[in-house]
Amino acid sequence: METKKMKKHIAIVLALFTAIFFLAGCGSSEPAEKVYLEESEIDAALSDGDSYKGKYINIAGKVFSIDKDGDTVAMQVWYDVENAEQQFIVYTDKELASGVKEDSFVRVDGKITGTFTGENYFGGEITALMIEAESLEIGGYDDIYAPAESTKEVGETQEQHGVSVTLDRVEYAKGEARVYVSVKNESGATASIYTFNAKAIQDGKQFEHQENYEAGYDNDIGDVLDGASKEGVIRFKGLDPDKGFKLTMEAYSDNWEIELEDFVFEIE
């Protein structure tokens, strides 16, 4: 089974590099002006790269496969990283691709050269947008794939019985809002702040915290020992960055004589 799988992978790689070298051989002179895709056109280009051939694109994703042939490096990248969907292929020279590994987040600026068509391990057809990279950045989820498009600095601290909760800031990024919270416990007992159960209300609609395993956020604050501090990130999908919202976090103490109320913040 492993031998068949390896042969299938080799066949895919050979087909991929054949397509790359063919496209390189068919290169034309550079246009006087680069025409970039609008953000709203990316989904369509991922489905039909041939219709956008010759245009330029700035796109980010997560690398899931890397292959090399001489000085040429080809990377298969997920655009929709949470669902491992909408792949595209980036090819460039090994110098530009230096430092890229599987699971790296990359942002690519380059020229669309068409669509690659091949088979996956199960014999099903795959199609992928092909991009000849001119520049390539490597980084983390929140600075390369989903950087903050706007930030609300809050810096509000609330205190109950020696437990202080600070809402530091709210970042609005592609498809999500990230709420940065810190807790300091000087109550004399362990306190628990359940950020995983945090809720937001905006325009009468309730939003639940949603995990993002791809981002690697340190999400839940949970138990905070007496004398300790912790930080966490609460993630919501669907919040309007142009409107305020109310954030509620449950809190408890191991000292039954201390009754902690929910920590509630109003973000304008």
Give the location of each predicted region:
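OB-fold nucleic-acid-binding modules
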Residues: 29-55, 133-138
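C-terminal motif of bacterial Sec signal peptides marking the signal peptidase cleavage site
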Residues: 22-25
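Short, surface-exposed binding/anchoring microloops in extracellular/periplasmic proteins
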Residues: 55-60, 64-65, 163-197
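Low-complexity, acidic Ser/Thr/Pro/Gly-rich terminal tails and inter-domain linkers that flank the onset
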Residues: 34-44, 144-173
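Bacterial N-terminal signal peptides that target proteins for export
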Residues: 3-13
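OB-fold single-stranded nucleic acid-binding module
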Residues: 64-145
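The feature marks short-to-medium sequence segments in extracytoplasmic or secretory-pathway proteins
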Residues: 72-95, 171-174, 184-236, 240, ...
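Terminal connector regions
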Residues: 125-130, 134-135, 139-148, 241-268
